[in-house]
Swiss-Prot record:
Binding site for L-glutamine: 55, 359, 387-390, 410, 467
Family: Belongs to the CTP synthase family.
Alphabetical GO biological process terms: 'de novo' CTP biosynthetic process; CTP biosynthetic process; pyrimidine nucleobase biosynthetic process
Protein name: CTP synthase
Taxonomic lineage: Archaea, Thermoproteota, Thermoprotei, Sulfolobales, Sulfolobaceae
InterPro entries assigned: Class_I_gatase-like, CTP_synthase, CTP_synthase_N, GATASE, GATase1_CTP_Synthase, P-loop_NTPase
Gene3D superfamilies linked to this entry: 3.40.50.880, P-loop containing nucleotide triphosphate hydrolases
EC number: 6.3.4.2
Length: 535
């Protein structure tokens, strides 16, 4: 069968839920037996998300093959249970880089290189290649930003051309836009949505489906009004409204038969779909079957924007739903723990578990170390991720080994005891973008340890994103003092450490949250939540 494409655009404002919509449609298609992938288009000039501030962009999601990508790829993976690749995130930076490289190589044979056709052709080539490399029958394409943004215009033109080239029944458009509810008048206002569709039609794109994003379900009158002014069938107007968890969205869409209608429009067979396990998971997330509520402190330096740690948050929810407890997340800015006037007991005294989050740089590091010490000394279940792992080593070296000046060379290049140091392969690296130790790496687990018990096997693969490692010169004295190295890389890097004397004290250089799935939680997060819940 010919490749099929579902292009999702957004209107009125950003963060309206395009990523969740794409992930939900993808999940419902996959559960019908179709091979599906999803492509996120980001119109910014950055080549990737790797050097962007989390406050600007949210989490940097790392794929199995080591790409630093938009957090929407995390939504795709979690909902669809399909691994994304570096080809699934297309940025304007990547597109222009390839076009300029081809021009320098003489590939355009002396032509004047222009947005049309050269840039738009490159965009289409990259979309098609992502579909091909993932063996997809159906490819979802999410165009970041909103219709009308100047940065998005070449991408919208490219997908307009894609429909012309691939055929009327092989490329369809789904447009999602805000439908604002005015509490004063008690009505849903559709005018902004209408204008966003008018803008799309000016570009030459007629939506096949419209998803109205509102606080409440769309009533029949509102749907008829939208249909009239957008030239879209009434039964192709779908409602996406506020719910307790984004994992409910596929259930809402399925109840309105959106995917069945999409398959009909694409001239594809509709198939039976079983959402029993998903509905059970959603009920557990909502706490319907919860045995108890647990308080988890998340200590980091970007906690004012929760999306900076979205995969960790979701991994906690997955593990909690799996064992039937409801997590209450307490976000703590690590800099708030650095002041001597703050009483750690007041902040951490009522939590059942502590996670020290990833991050870079010296800001807030001492606050994280205080949280780690508090967890270790008060025997509170603890999980350290990436930088949290490295600072666990620093804390242990200072407070157990008595190396009071121990530190990471990232924080203090001249530290007397550099227990964390730059990876050998990083010492001659001068560029920041795409140069860390990235992607899935082999971890060899030590039998008889907590890590081995959690994973249930000797060799595992987890994703990474770091430049620093535990200094091999200090491993022996750390182990002599009671720290257990339970996981190492093929070349001997320390990957996982634990303290068997504590209820649960585990830290890892990896990011196991990136591989956590709703119905298949990360083993490390599952072990942590079990310890927190005392189950």
């Amino acid at each position: 069968m010919p490749n099929k494409y579902i292009v999702v655009t957004g209107g009125v404002l950003s963060s309206v839920g395009k990523g969740t919509l794409v992930a939900s449609i993808g999940m419902l298609l996959k559960r019908r037996g179709y091979n599906v992938t999803a492509v996120k288009i980001d119109p910014y000039i950055n080549v990737d998300a790797g050097t962007m501030n989390p406050y600007m962009h949210g989490e940097v999601f790392v794929t199995e093959d080591g790409a630093e990508t938009d957090l929407d790829l995390g939504h795709y993976e979690r909902f669809m249970d399909v691994n994304m690749t570096k080809y699934n995130n297309i940025t304007a930076g990547k597109v222009y880089f390839e076009v300029i490289k081809k021009e320098r190589e003489g590939k355009y044979l002396g032509q004047t290189v222009q947005i049309i056709p050269h840039v738009t052709d490159q965009i289409k080539d990259m979309i098609r290649y992502a579909s091909k490399i993932n063996n997809a029958e159906i490819t979802l394409v999410e165009i970041g930003g909103t219709v009308g943004d100047i940065e998005s215009l070449p991408f919208l033109e490219a997908v307009r051309q894609l429909k012309l080239e691939e055929g009327e029944d092989n490329v369809i458009f789904v447009h999602i836009a805000l439908v604002e509810y005015l509490s004063v008048t008690g009505e849903l206002k559709t005018k902004p949505l209408q204008h966003s569709v008018q803008e799309l039609r000016r570009i030459g794109i007629q939506p096949d489906f419209i998803v109205g994003r509102a606080t409440l379900p769309l009533d029949d009158e509102t749907r008829r009004k939208i249909a009239l002014f957008t030239n879209v069938k009434v039964d192709h107007i779908v409602s996406s409204y506020d719910v307790e968890t984004s994992y409910e969205v596929p259930i809402i869409l399925e109840s309105q038969k959106l995917v069945s209608k999409i398959l009909s429009r694409l001239k594809l067979e509709d198939r039976q779909v079983d959402l029993t396990d998903w509905i059970s998971f959603v009920n557990n997330i909502k706490g319907i079957n919860s045995k108890k509520t647990i308080n988890i402190a998340l200590v980091g330096k970007y906690t004012k924007l929760k999306d900076s740690y979205i995969s960790i948050k979701e991994a906690i929810y997955h593990a909690s739903a799996y064992i039937g407890v409801r997590p209450k997340l307490i976000w703590i800015e690590s800099t708030d723990l650095e002041s001597d006037t703050k009483n750690l007991n007041e902040i951490l005294g009522n939590v059942n578990g502590i996670i020290v989050l990833p991050g870079f740089g010296s800001r807030g590091a001492e606050g994280k170390i205080k949280a780690i010490k508090y967890a270790r000394e008060h025997n509170i279940p603890f999980l350290g991720i990436c930088f949290g792992f490295q600072l666990s080593i620093v804390e242990f070296a200072r407070d157990v080994l008595g190396l009071s000046e121990a530190n990471s060379t990232e924080i203090n290049p001249n530290t007397k005891d550099p227990v964390i140091t730059l990876l050998d392969e990083q010492k001659n690296v001068t560029q920041l973008g795409g140069t860390m130790r990235l992607g899935a790496q082999k971890i060899i687990l030590k039998e008889g340890t907590i890590a081995y018990q959690l994973y249930g096997k000797k060799v595992v693969y987890e994703r990474h994103r770091h430049r620093y490692e535990v200094n091999p010169k200090y491993v022996d004295i750390l182990e002599d003092a009671g720290l257990v190295v339970s996981g190492i890389s093929e070349n001997g890097l320390v990957e996982i450490i634990e303290l068997p004397s504590n209820k649960f004290f585990v830290a890892t250089q990896a990011h196991p949250e990136f591989k956590s799935r709703p119905t298949n939680p990360s083993p490390i997060y599952l072990g942590f939540i079990r310890a927190v819940a005392s189950l």
